Amino acid sequence: MLGYTGTYKGKRLSVQGTGMGIPSFSIYATELIKEYQVKTLVRVGTCGAMQKEVEIGDVVLAQAASTDSSLIRNIFGPAIAFAPTADFTLLYTAYNQAVNTGLKVRAGNIISVDRFYDEEIDNDKLTDFGILAVDMETAALYTLAARYKARGLALLTVSDHLITGEHADADTRQTGFNDMIKTALETVTSLEGMP
């Protein structure tokens, strides 16, 4: 998996591919934190919308991430349902950055799932409980950030809609992803003293 280190507006930062899903993401995130002392992790990726008002191309800031993965149960056991959440400073800064640049942004809860094609999951119930979108990594990001006292945030561009069946075309993907990545870069570099 490729990773790069460079500068943005004079500030040093790294970009790292993490693969797909919680197991792959967990390996890369853990090694970044433990081996390289990374203290701020921002995931940029895609998600599938689960609310009618969330549209293709919208940016979703994951405030918290439920999961069907055994990740949390393996750490806490069956008695505790740990709620993995974003770092508030990152979330607040990214939200304001997105709004100020005219992006259509939504902040709220998502779900990170283990299977891309999952016919058993009750999407209607998740929608009724206000879940905005689905991805496959954010719960791991927030859980590992909490475990290792790092900061975590996921910015996700809606590429597919689970309710309407819509999919982003190539132009929407390119433009939307660029806007999301710029928001992430501006967020990280705007915070003074953030490692």
Give short role names for the model-derived ranges:
Residues 1-84, 88-92:
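Metabolite-binding pocket within alpha/beta catalytic cores that recognizes anionic/polar moieties
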Residues 23-26, 136-141:
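Short glycine/serine/threonine-rich phosphate/pyrophosphate-binding segments
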Residues 39-43, 133-135, 152:
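Short glycine-aspartate micro-motif
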Residues 80-129:
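Active-site rim beta-loop-alpha module in soluble metabolic enzymes
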Residues 93-101, 144, 183-194:
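Generic non-transmembrane alpha-helical segments
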Residues 139-173:
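Zn-dependent metallopeptidase/amidohydrolase metal-coordination segment
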Residues 162-195:
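His/Asp/Glu-rich mid-to-C-terminal helical/loop segments that flank catalytic regions of hydrolases
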